[in-house]
């Protein structure tokens, strides 16, 4: 949506992700990321850590379950989402403001680690962020080679999410939309785009 602050944070998980379910059954995982800037001091010839930024993150639905199953305390992660500000009064009546991240994408950093990714089946019907080269049209299909047949799908935060605002990105207007590598795009070439292809998207 227009006017939202989208940021990407790279840091380490402070705790294991905490998975919970709303009364309607939607999964939500909360976790905290510590991002610490490092600079090289030429005088002492060593790296120095700056002040850490601690950010509480929340991710919804199938992605929440995937995060809870895949990530652990101490792992280095890359998190992208919408920065939100929330104000409240503490027990002493002092007004406080916190910043939180409503996560769109999250993954392990492979700078100093390896990972084997396993694609999950879409149980939650979450709409789509396409993978590399995700197609155009109304709704985008997901991942490497996934395609949507033009049927509108649910997306965004669940109905009982207090931060939900308006229609999710993509508009849920149907119209098809290929996903990722090997997927078809909007009504072109007639393929369903369901299989994996080694062909790069460019």
Swiss-Prot record:
Pfam families: SSB. GO terms for molecular function: single-stranded DNA binding. Residues 1-110 form the SSB domain. One of its GO terms (biological process) is DNA replication. HAMAP family: SSB. Keywords: DNA-binding. Residues 115-202 are annotated as: Disordered. Homotetramer. This is Single-stranded DNA-binding protein 1. The gene is ssb1. It comes from Streptomyces avermitilis (strain ATCC 31267 / DSM 46492 / JCM 5070 / NBRC 14893 / NCIMB 12804 / NRRL 8165 / MA-4680). NCBIfam families: PRK07772.1, ssb. GO terms for cellular component: nucleoid. InterPro entries: NA-bd_OB-fold, Primosome_PriB/ssb, ssDNA-bd.
